[in-house]
C-alpha cells in the first residue's frame, strides 16, 4: 500500500563505557542525544542492548522526548520518539509511556524479537492497526508457565503465545498499558497537524486575527483529523460516516 513506510536509519556509535551497566546505559542515552543534535528526523528507536539498566533508561528517555505545553510555548521543537525493546526478565517493572517491550527467553535474545515485532507491524504506520494478534517471523515461543504469562500481562510486557493452536503476540500494549496503536496514532496526529499548520503559515502572506484567519487555521486542523479518520486512527460515525471528533 502507498501508506506503508519502510525507512530505516542505522546509527553506529562506540560501545558505551562505564563502571557498571547503569553508567553504560547513561552513556548510551548521551550518545543518542548527541546523534539528535545533527539528525533528529526519525521516530522509532531500536537498539542492540537488552540489559535491564539499558531498557529502563531507554524507556525513561523515550517518555521524556515529548515536550510539555510549556516547553512548546517556549519554542522547543517537537521530535518525540517511541522505543521498542526486548527483555528476558520476567520480573521487569517498567511503567513509562512511549515505549513497548516484548519478552523472550535468554537463549533467544539473538533473535531480536523487538525488531521482528516492529518489522511485522510497523510498516503499516501511520495506518492504525491492532498490534495484538500479530505473528512476527523468526522468533521462538518462550518457555513460560501460565502464571508467568499472567505476570507479563500485568506488567504490560508483550509476548508470543499460543491459544487455540494459534500463535500470536499478546497484548499489543505500551509499558504504561496504553495500546500501541493508540499512542502511535496520537503521535501521528500531532505530527501531521504541525505540518498542516506550518503549511498555512508559509503559504499565506499573512494569517489575520479575523474570521478568515481562524478559518485557515481551522482548515488545517480539520484536514488533520479527517486524515486520521481515513487512516483508522479516529473512529467513524456509523450513520454519517464522518470522523467522531469535535473542534472547540
Could you tell me what each predicted segment is?
Residues 1-248:
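Surface-exposed assembly/interface segments
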Amino acid at each position: 500500500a502507498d501508506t506503508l513506510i519502510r525507512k530505516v536509519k542505522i546509527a553506529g556509535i562506540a560501545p558505551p563505557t562505564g563502571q557498571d551497566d547503569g553508567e553504560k546505559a547513561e552513556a548510551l542515552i548521551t550518545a543518542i542525544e548527541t546523534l539528535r543534535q545533527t539528525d533528529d528526523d526519525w521516530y522509532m528507536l531500536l537498539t542492540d542492548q537488552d540489559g535491564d539498566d539499558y531498557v529502563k533508561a531507554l524507556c525513561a528517555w523515550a517518555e521524556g522526548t515529548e515536550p510539555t505545553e510549556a516547553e512548546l510555548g517556549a519554542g522547543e521543537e517537537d521530535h518525540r520518539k517511541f522505543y521498542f525493546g526486548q527483555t528476558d526478565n520476567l520480573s521487569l517493572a517498567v511503567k513509562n509511556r512511549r515505549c513497548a517491550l516484548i519478552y523472550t527467553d535468554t537463549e533467544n535474545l539473538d533473535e531480536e524479537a523487538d525488531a521482528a515485532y516492529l518489522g511485522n507491524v510497523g510498516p503499516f504506520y501511520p495506518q492504525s492497526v491492532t498490534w495484538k494478534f500479530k505473528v512476527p517471523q523468526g522468533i521462538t515461543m518462550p518457555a513460560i508457565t501460565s502464571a508467568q504469562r499472567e505476570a507479563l500481562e500485568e506488567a504490560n510486557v508483550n509476548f508470543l503465545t499460543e491459544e487455540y493452536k494459534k500463535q500470536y503476540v499478546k497484548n499489543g500494549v505500551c509499558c504504561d498499558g496504553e495500546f500501541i496503536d493508540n499512542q502511535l496514532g496520537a503521535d501521528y496526529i500531532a505530527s501531521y497537524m504541525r505540518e498542516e499548520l506550518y503549511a498555512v503559515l508559509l503559504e499565506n502572506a499573512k494569517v489575520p486575527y479575523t474570521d478568515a484567519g481562524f478559518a485557515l487555521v481551522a482548515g488545517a486542523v480539520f484536514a488533520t483529523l479527517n486524515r486520521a479518520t481515513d487512516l483508522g486512527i479516529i473512529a467513524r460515525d456509523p450513520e454519517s460516516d464522518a470522523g467522531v471528533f469535535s473542534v472547540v
